[in-house]
Amino acid sequence: MKTRPKTRIKTRVKICGIRSPKDIEFAALYGADAVGFITEVPVESPRKLDSDTAAALISKVPKCLDSVMVIMPETSTSALELIEKVKPNIVQIHSDLPLSELKAVREKADIPIIKTLSVPAEQEAPKLHNIVTRLLEEVRELEESGIVDSVLLDSGIAGKTGGTGCVHDWDLSRRIAEETELPLILAGGLKPENVQEAIRSVSPYAVDTASGVETQGKKDSVKVRKFIEEVRCTYAFL
């Protein structure tokens, strides 16, 4: 296991699934670091946007926030077309795009790339070792490639690779965080009530939430504020 000096850091916050100017306003007002826009994804999601809507919203994001476009492209060409149209600060790739295609995105778009990896939730203990081994291999390959800027670990369940609202085994995420120099973003079922425990357990570079700050399917300003307050009151050590 890699060992590094323990450094006190401030965990960054990404509010994902933004759908309106009000959502952006809440995130900026309460001190988020980034906002995510789920764009043209080929799966059912109450938070997905068409590219025109995503572009219009991203144009309203203040400079104090990073705009992250979350996409599930099958090719680098489709990813690059969306990046060109929507113009985010950062792109989050939430698909099994091969390294060669990721490299093409990096070289032609020249913006930071977050690569999402799915961590199966509700796994039996005997299977956890195999899951950790597989994820570590993926993370090491990404790190050695130098193509991506960070990895995001999200919970997968019942064929869904993210947006489940489910928490996965944070010990898995912690073990991955300890083995890589890539910044690790933790997602999956995070909400005001559990985000401090998540940070203490994993020491992530950032935390990501969507449904955890919603009420009846819409961003709740009280929950957004509470989530960010809980994060700011917790320091992780890396």
UniProtKB/Swiss-Prot annotation:
This is N-(5'-phosphoribosyl)anthranilate isomerase. PANTHER family: N-(5'-PHOSPHORIBOSYL)ANTHRANILATE ISOMERASE (PTHR42894:SF1). HAMAP family: PRAI. The keyword Amino-acid biosynthesis applies. Belongs to the TrpF family. It comes from the Archaea. Pfam families: PRAI. Gene3D superfamilies: Aldolase class I. Pathway: Amino-acid biosynthesis; L-tryptophan biosynthesis; L-tryptophan from chorismate: step 3/5. Coiled coil: none annotated. It catalyses: N-(5-phospho-beta-D-ribosyl)anthranilate = 1-(2-carboxyphenylamino)-1-deoxy-D-ribulose 5-phosphate. Its EC number is 5.3.1.24. InterPro entries: Aldolase_TIM (IPR013785), PRAI_dom (IPR001240), RibuloseP-bd_barrel (IPR011060), TrpF_fam (IPR044643). Keywords: Amino-acid biosynthesis, Aromatic amino acid biosynthesis, Isomerase, Tryptophan biosynthesis. GO terms for biological process: L-tryptophan biosynthetic process. The keyword Nuclease does not apply.
